[in-house]
Swiss-Prot record:
Endpoints of the signal sequence: none
Function: Part of the ABC transporter complex LolCDE involved in the translocation of mature outer membrane-directed lipoproteins, from the inner membrane to the periplasmic chaperone, LolA. Responsible for the formation of the LolA-lipoprotein complex in an ATP-dependent manner.
Domain ABC transporter: 1-223
Lineage, broadest ranks: Bacteria, Pseudomonadati, Acidobacteriota, Terriglobia, Terriglobales
Presence of keyword rRNA-binding: no
Protein name: Lipoprotein-releasing system ATP-binding protein LolD
Length: 223
């Protein structure tokens, strides 16, 4: 697989001849320097972008061949996303933000809010469901965003620097929560991170450098 960006008359090759597999149930970290293409790779794997060349397969499904509508349906059905910034809707409560993906799917409000409360409890914020994002700390906002990502019960969690905007102590809390939910709900998780101590705790580590991907032993990373 390759990804090329055009800048004027110049082609910028982000990566090429990239090939790897992620197995069901694995927790995989994607690491690399800033600008190495980590987030772009996650976007391609999550059917938010297309490779310039090659294919991405989800089981037998060729993601690069999906129409925009089919890709959106695939993401809604199979994937949950967490970003560095929480992207919570400020005018809605934590409970309402978490319930939103289910309401968009057409689930009734009562059922959606019942499921949202379950996930509020899972992230330790059941007593904060009536608060709006501006009334929550950064760590609490990110935990709500994680609950929103998982409320649809996706098979795969995709996280792009989920602890990047948090202080060390809060980042540890959020990463531990991701790891527990990964295990408890038998997720497959892809986590872009610059935190090598967190990457070390994943099952596998994929490193991007100079347009090339290679796999490194997690225990070889600094603790």
């Amino acid at each position: 697989m390759a990804k090329v960006f055009r800048s004027g008359s110049t082609d910028l090759r982000l990566f090429e001849n990239l090939s790897f597999q992620v197995m069901k149930g694995e927790m995989v970290a994607i690491v690399g320097d800033s600008g190495s293409g980590k987030s772009s790779l996650l976007h391609i794997l999550g059917a938010l972008d297309r490779p310039s060349d090659g294919d991405v397969y989800f089981a037998e499904l060729r993601l690069a061949k999906l129409s925009e509508a089919a890709a959106a349906e695939f993401r809604n059905r199979e994937l949950g996303f967490v970003w560095q910034f929480h992207y919570l809707l400020p005018e809605f409560t934590a409970l309402e933000n978490i319930a939103m993906p289910l309401l968009v799917r057409g689930l009734g409000r009562r059922e959606a809010e019942t499921e949202a409360r379950h996930w509020l409890n899972e992230v330790g914020l059941l007593d904060r469901g009536h608060h709006r994002p501006g009334e929550l700390s950064g760590g609490e906002q990110q935990r709500v965003a994680l609950a929103r990502a998982l409320v649809t019960r996706p098979k795969v969690l995709m996280a792009d620097e989920p602890t990047g905007d948090l202080d060390n102590r809060t980042a540890e809390t959020v990463f531990n929560l991701i790891a527990r939910l990964h295990r408890d709900y038998q997720l497959t998780s892809l986590i872009v991170t610059h935190n090598l101590a967190f990457a070390r705790r994943c099952d596998r580590v994929i490193r991007l450098a100079a347009g090339v991907v290679d796999e490194v032993e997690p225990q070889s990373l600094p603790a």
